[in-house]
Amino acid sequence: MAAGKEIRGKIKSVENTKKITKAMEMVSVSKMRKAQERMRAARPYSEKIRNIAANLGKANPEYTHAFMKKNDAKALGFIIVTSDKGLCGGLNTNLLRAVTAKLREAQAAGVAIESVAIGSKGLGFLNRIGARVVAHVTHLGDTPHLDKLIGPVKTLLDAYAEGKLSAVYLSYTKFINTIKQEPLVEQLLPLAEDSLKVEEGQHSWDYIYEPDAQSVIDELLVRYVESLVYQAVAENMASEHSARMVAMKAATDNAGNVISELKLVYNKTRQAGITKELSEIVSGAAAAAGV
């Protein structure tokens, strides 16, 4: 029964793996819910800033912030948001494939690239392809804080404000639902004019500025862009935990199927052994009776 013992060992090994993947699935479910709550909580903040900035811009049409101006520089900035950990299906692979296509397009046009990596997977990818990484932040944990993001992101924002970059792109995985996540490479700067338009029917407020309207608009637009990056990180984190939950569930289900198949093989092997032993006993008894 050496074969049977070997199969029992395989069954035990797969059962242990199944316990691990099931535990990881349950942990991902809990983290996914919390990440979704943070993602939804961040949306009203950026929307409120956008509304105020839109009203201020409408009241001061003569002033154009640097983030609204188009630059002629032959360089692009990329903020790439990925996860720190793996085991989340094709989440990072799909995003980095979209980023690669955009980078190749820029390189073919002879445009220089400056990158900021948020997440270990994106940083590793940029290092492998030899991209210029001007700043990075990793290991944000399950509760990302804006103050950890501001420093690296500010590197590209300042470069754009100084006219050194013609555009800044933000790449992340947008959370659609638990099953579906969408990799995106969106233009962050210059800000689209439509993004700061006052919506029809929306009440316009009169503000008292301290110290002046220009200073307030400058500060608000910086905060608005930072909030967009934070929102992208929150969306990516919700997508990560959702993708990991689905991947671990699939792994658990596959482990269950493998266990069922191994048990079937084990039972057949055991049955064959028993049949062989019975045949030998019957043959021996028949031989003894004939003597």
From Swiss-Prot:
Protein name in UniProt: ATP synthase gamma chain
Signal sequence interval, chain numbering: none
GO cellular component, one term: proton-transporting ATP synthase complex
Membrane association type: Peripheral membrane protein
Protein keywords: ATP synthesis, Cell inner membrane, Cell membrane, CF(1), Hydrogen ion transport, Ion transport, Membrane, Transport
Pfam families given in the database record: ATP-synt (PF00231)
Domain of life: Bacteria
Similarity comment: family membership: Belongs to the ATPase gamma chain family.
GO BP field: proton motive force-driven plasma membrane ATP synthesis
Localisation per UniProt entry: Cell inner membrane
Function (record text): Produces ATP from ADP in the presence of a proton gradient across the membrane. The gamma chain is believed to be important in regulating ATPase activity and the flow of protons through the CF(0) complex.
